[in-house]
Each structure stands twice: as C-alpha cells, then as structure tokens.
Amino acid sequence: MENGAAPTAPAVIVAIDGPSGTGKSSTSKAVAAQLGLSYLDTGAQYRAITWWMVTNGIDTDDPHAVAAAAGKPEIVSGTDPAGPTITVDGVDVAGPIRTQEVTSKVSAVSAVPEVRARITELQRTIAAAAPLGIVVEGRDIGTTVLPDADLKIFLTASAEARAARRSGELKGADVHATREALIKRDAADSSRKTSPLAKAGDAVEVDTTALSLPQVIECVVTLVEEKRAGK
C-alpha cells in the first residue's frame, strides 16, 4: 500500500467448494470481510444465467437451446463481501435468482458445457483482477475454475444438517422436502460430465455438521492466514 501504510499480506486466492447447505456463502463472505479480500459467489452467476433463460422463454430442458443462448446475457458480479451484487443486462437480480423456479432449473442449465465455459471464463477474469486476493465459493472452483488456487477448502455436512439450514433460508420450506431436493441436486451436480461437484485432491476438508458458523469461520481464517504466512 502507498502513503507509508503497513505492507499488506500477499494476495491470496481461496477456493471454497461443497454442496448446498454446508455454510459456503456465510463462511466465504465472513472470511473475505475479515481478511480484506474480495468475494465471489459463483452459484449466483449460474442462477443469474438460469433466471435469464427462464425470463426469456428458453426451454431449460433443451441443452441445445441453452447452449445457443449462453453468450447473450451480460452478467456482472460485485465482489464486496459486505454487499455482493449481481446484475443481468443491468438489472439487479439478487432477489429473483433465489426463487424456487430458478433453484429447480439451475442444475440443468449449469450442466451445459457452453454455459460452464462462459461462466468459468468470467470467474477467472474476476479472480485475476482482485487486488488483494479473493475468496471464491462454488462447486468446481478448486478442481476446474481455479486449480492453482493458493488454498482449497471443501465444506461438508450431513444431509440432515444441510436441509435444516436451507429450509431456514427458504421461507416456509419443508425440511424433509428440502433434504430430498438437496440429495437430488447433489446427485445431478456430482454426475454431470462437465466440471462435476468434486473435492480437489489437495483440498482441506472441513465437516461443518457439528460446528457453529463462528467456529467454521475461525477455522477457515486460520487456514488462510497460515497459507499467507508461508507465501
């Protein structure tokens, strides 16, 4: 930093992967804020392109139609962990992308190779431009998007714990139905041909089932600080 400020820690790129309901978003945002890093929710980008497909009448069950439209929407992600934003063609879609309709279609859209290529390129560009480093959360960050990330973390939790957390986030959601939906999405994301949900071989696995959010955050912050100290 200029103006006689204390030298900053080396820029660090942190990849946090895992299925839904493991605490990825809450952990990633808090860690980024605590360490002065940028933050990127890659799931929101896939939700955003899915929302655009639905809004524009694209049949999300037709991979050819989805592939043909993949390059059309302009998706912009704000990376401030205190208030991350996402817009599509200039429209704020932070709320609309969290609907049940988008949630039910995002796996199918995300499985289309042309969509993954488009969004992956966008994610790499954002990560490379982060001045002090970035925490990037998703499902294939450590394996595909940023295989050279300084630190890779894979969050896990039991299906029951994840369902309870997700149903708390989705107003009025039934825990049993949420659990079934999570298991179905895990299967879809883990079995897709292009960039499946998977733990990188060099990732640190953190089971969040019995941990409070502050405990998970503390664990990840410690891992990042150890990695930065060794750079």
UniProtKB/Swiss-Prot annotation:
EC number of the protein: 2.7.4.25
Reaction(s) the record says it catalyses: CMP + ATP = CDP + ADP; dCMP + ATP = dCDP + ADP
InterPro entries according to UniProt: Cytidylate_kin, Cytidylate_kinase_dom, P-loop_NTPase
Alphabetical UniProt keywords: ATP-binding, Cytoplasm, Kinase, Nucleotide-binding, Transferase
Residues annotated to bind ATP: 18-26
Top-tier EC class: transferase
Signal peptide boundaries: none
GO molecular function, one term: dCMP kinase activity
Domain of life: Bacteria
CDD domains per record: CMPK (cd02020)
Pfam families: Cytidylate_kin
GO terms classed as biological process: nucleobase-containing small molecule interconversion; pyrimidine nucleotide metabolic process
Main location: cytoplasm
Homology family: Belongs to the cytidylate kinase family. Type 1 subfamily.
Protein name, per record: Cytidylate kinase
Organism: Streptomyces coelicolor (strain ATCC BAA-471 / A3(2) / M145)
Record gene name: cmk
